[in-house]
Structure formats: structure tokens, C-alpha cells
């Protein structure tokens, strides 16, 4: 199986769409993807993602299945230095170094900073969504690995 992840074109966040440059990029992307043998398309519910996919889907005469968990991760946390809400992956190294559990794959969502957001629930929403998608193609999670069932395939999927 080939999974191709494509990020949205240059966004205009104010209108949840694309800038002029983003629209040009989406059109150029559609020319490239036209050469690919893609079996299924999946897309975030956000406008900028749908707009990026629109040219490719139109050229392929296809539709994308909208998966809510593909939207940008929305779990702001409280910055311990400023007291303001912020995205959790944008801390300076000093904050990360003072919170070594953020590097631990079992503890990072339990960190007091991450607990100020809805991190664990959001993380599970995304990972459960990905696991469901992969299981549809015959790849079933078992701890840190995925087992390939007899139902696996060599399809190409754009996300």
C-alpha cells in the first residue's frame, strides 16, 4: 500500500481557503497527481484542504471521503511562561528541556502543560482514525506494529 500525504496549499486562514499562490499550487499538483493510479482519496473537512484537493478530484472525476480526524490538530495548551493558549508543538527548546517527559511516548500527554489542553483525547481521536483507515486496507495495529492481514493490497491512497 502506498499512502501519499499532501498538505494543503498556501492558506488564507481568515477565509479557510487558499491564497492566489495556493490555488496555483493546487492546480499544478493536479497535473502531477493525474499520472498516479490512486484508488481512494481522503480529505480534511477544512476548506483549505478541500480547495487544494478540488483540482485533482475534478480532473480524476472522483470524490474524496471527508475524515474529521484529518483536520489540523486542534488542542491548544496554556503556555507556562505567558499564560496564553498556544499550539503544543511550538515550544522553545528551554521549555522542552525543562519537561523531559514530553519526549516520552508514554508520558507526554500526561505532562502538566499538555493537561491544560485536551491533548490525550485529541491524540486518541487522530490515532484511532488512522488505525481505522489502515485496518480498512488490511493493516491492523498490534501495540507499536501493524500486522498485515490476508486482505492487504497494493493500492495507492491520497490523504
Q: Which residues make up each language-model segment?
A:
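Phosphate-handling substructures
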Residues: 61-144
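Aromatic-acidic/polar surface patches that form glycan- and anion
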Residues: 18, 42-45, 119, 123, ...
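A broad, low-specificity signal for short, low-complexity segments enriched in glycine/proline
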Residues: 1-5, 117-120, 155
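A generic local structural motif
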Residues: 26-31, 140-146
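Extended, basic/helix-rich recognition subdomains
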Residues: 148-159
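Active-site-proximal alpha-helix that buttresses catalytic centers in soluble enzyme cores
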Residues: 1-71
Amino acid at each position: 500500500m502506498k499512502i501519499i500525504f499532501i498538505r494543503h496549499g498556501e492558506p488564507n486562514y481568515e477565509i479557510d481557503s487558499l491564497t492566489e499562490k495556493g490555488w496555483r499550487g493546487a492546480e499544478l499538483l493536479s497535473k502531477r497527481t493525474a499520472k498516479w493510479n490512486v484508488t481512494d482519496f481522503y480529505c480534511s473537512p477544512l476548506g483549505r484542504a478541500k480547495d487544494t484537493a478540488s483540482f485533482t478530484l475534478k480532473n480524476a472525476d472522483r470524490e474524496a471521503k471527508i475524515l474529521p480526524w484529518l483536520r489540523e490538530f486542534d488542542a491548544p495548551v496554556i503556555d507556562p511562561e505567558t499564560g496564553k493558549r498556544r499550539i503544543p508543538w511550538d515550544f522553545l527548546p528551554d521549555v522542552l528541556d525543562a519537561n523531559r517527559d514530553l519526549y516520552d511516548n508514554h508520558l507526554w500527554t500526561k505532562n502538566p502543560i499538555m493537561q491544560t489542553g485536551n491533548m490525550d483525547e485529541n491524540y486518541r481521536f487522530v490515532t484511532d482514525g488512522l488505525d481505522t483507515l489502515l485496518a480498512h486496507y488490511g493493516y491492523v495495529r498490534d501495540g507499536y506494529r501493524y500486522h498485515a492481514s490476508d486482505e492487504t493490497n497494493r493500492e495507492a491512497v491520497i490523504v
